[in-house]
Amino acid sequence: MSIVYINIFLAFIMSLLGMLIYRSHLMSSLLCLEGMMLSLFVMITLIILNNHFTLASMTPIILLVFAACEAALGLSLLVMVSNTYGNDYVQNLNLLQC
């Protein structure tokens, strides 16, 4: 395993830890989720290029499409919550409240 793969894997782990530690604000959770998607994209692209998988060459593009949809939904949810409650705390997203 080369140093590039280890660095990308560490970037994914750091984003995952950031998601677990800074989960009180929605904006920080969205940024950590985008970091995870970026590291997954780079890792999948490098694996496909190094191993010459021609059949899986569309996989990074599909991952980018899902990441863009996730970012759009996350930002719209952030705008809705901040307009409704005035802050971006994740505790405001509890759907079981009356």
Curated annotation (Swiss-Prot):
It is an enzyme of class 7 (translocase). InterPro entries: NADH_UbQ_OxRdtase_chain4L/K, NUOK/Mnh_C1-like. Keywords: Electron transport, Membrane, Mitochondrion, Mitochondrion inner membrane, NAD, Respiratory chain, Translocase, Transmembrane, Transmembrane helix, Transport, Ubiquinone. It comes from the Eukaryota. It catalyses: a ubiquinone + NADH + 5 H(+)(in) = a ubiquinol + NAD(+) + 4 H(+)(out). It is a multi-pass membrane protein. One of its GO terms (cellular component) is respiratory chain complex I. The chain crosses the membrane at residues 1-21, 29-49, 61-81. GO terms for biological process: ATP synthesis coupled electron transport. Belongs to the complex I subunit 4L family. Core subunit of the mitochondrial membrane respiratory chain NADH dehydrogenase (Complex I) which catalyzes electron transfer from NADH through the respiratory chain, using ubiquinone as an electron acceptor. Part of the enzyme membrane arm which is embedded in the lipid bilayer and involved in proton translocation. Core subunit of respiratory chain NADH dehydrogenase (Complex I) which is composed of 45 different subunits. This is NADH-ubiquinone oxidoreductase chain 4L. The gene is MT-ND4L.
